[in-house]
Amino acid sequence: MNISMVGIDYNTASIEDREHFTLTSDKQLEIAKIIKETYHASGCIILSTCNRTEIWFSELGTSEAECFHQLVLGENAKETMRSICVCRQGDEAVTYLMELGCGIHSQIFGEDQILTQLKQALQQARDYQYVDSVLECLFRTAITAAKKVKTSIQIAKGNTSLPQTIVEQLEKEQGDLLGKSCLVIGNGEMGRLMTEKLLEKKCKVWMTLRQYKKSKAIIPEGSGVVLYDERYEHIAVMDYIFSATKSHHFTINKSMFENIRLKGKTYCLIDLAIPRDIEPSVEELSDVTVYNMDYFCQEVNDREKELEETRELLSEYVNEFKQWYQFRNLVSTVDDISNIVSDITDAKLTKVYKSIDLSREQQELLQSNVQMAAKKAVSKIIFGLRDVLQIDQCEEVLQALEQSAMNCTDSVK
């Protein structure tokens, strides 16, 4: 299979490293255009999240790693950056994507957000028309497989999102969060999820909002609102500050923060962004603790049974996709045979149609339904060959069937 991927994730790259691989939507579109027009790939899909940046290719005619280095890192990338990239091809890539959708390769084992991110990556590729039928089918199959795993196997135990994990770990380490004052900087999906989890714990929560987005914002019920430009006026009295924006500049910097702190008060800052929202030097302040998302990762312990069951179920979807991939070039031949059989059926039943007392509209409807039924029956039988024959055998049989069908057409005429 000429399917491949290249990328980095939290396993190979630290937060500091992952910052260099972050791709905006505009940058993703620019890269996809080059992959299609310059590297002549049949299709591509780009997945860019806080924990991973991956490019998926169909029919790429050059080195995946070289393509990634040139388009994402640039020619002046350090060798250490190049060394953390991972390439997967063929069966390995297909199996990896199936597992990825289930959360097996996520920091929070079994988390659900990766499935949403796969859907969004696929939809963006559709919207900008840089996905081909192969990657379309692969990602749809992976999404379907992940949904099946989620409903059939309990691979996640309790916390299936980063915000949930953060809340649980903060309670474990620092005690009850009831009544704690929290500021969430950022009104995107992660910010809203974090706010909702904090509200569930009966925290007093405020979210920042940029003035120009005020009318479009979705604020979880129970949360207060703070204008983004006024955030420093409120930070001083907060117990916890969470930052989850897509900004490429710091939302909290050391010089501003150290001047607004209250004497004798300790602060807990949680950075949920890549690139980071909180200036690293803030950690130098003695009364401040800064956490990043890597701190809250969940180790995979005692998951052998769930992993075995998941992989066994996923193997069915992997095989299903591989069969489709091998058979896809024969679909037009199957359609041709089905159409010929439909025409023959229609010709053979002409006298029967005329002998039945039906109106013209009823006769046309009956004729159309019979033709459709004939097409479906033939297609189903022929596609069933995939289960009993090798691909080369299927090709030979289809060629023979097509020739036979055409001969039948000649005799009917």
Curated annotation (Swiss-Prot):
The active site is at C50 (nucleophile). Coiled coil: none annotated. Pathway: Porphyrin-containing compound metabolism; protoporphyrin-IX biosynthesis; 5-aminolevulinate from L-glutamyl-tRNA(Glu): step 1/2. GO terms for molecular function: glutamyl-tRNA reductase activity; NADP binding. Its EC number is 1.2.1.70. Substrate binds at T49, C50, N51, R52, S106, E111, D112, Q113, Q117. It holds the Pfam family GlutR_dimer. Keywords: NADP, Oxidoreductase, Porphyrin biosynthesis. NADP(+) binds at G186, N187, G188, E189, M190, G191. One of its GO terms (biological process) is protoporphyrinogen IX biosynthetic process from glutamate. Catalyzes the NADPH-dependent reduction of glutamyl-tRNA(Glu) to glutamate 1-semialdehyde (GSA). Possesses an unusual extended V-shaped dimeric structure with each monomer consisting of three distinct domains arranged along a curved 'spinal' alpha-helix. The N-terminal catalytic domain specifically recognizes the glutamate moiety of the substrate. The second domain is the NADPH-binding domain, and the third C-terminal domain is responsible for dimerization. During catalysis, the active site Cys acts as a nucleophile attacking the alpha-carbonyl group of tRNA-bound glutamate with the formation of a thioester intermediate between enzyme and glutamate, and the concomitant release of tRNA(Glu). The thioester intermediate is finally reduced by direct hydride transfer from NADPH, to form the product GSA. Belongs to the glutamyl-tRNA reductase family. This is Glutamyl-tRNA reductase 2. It comes from Lachnoclostridium phytofermentans (strain ATCC 700394 / DSM 18823 / ISDg).
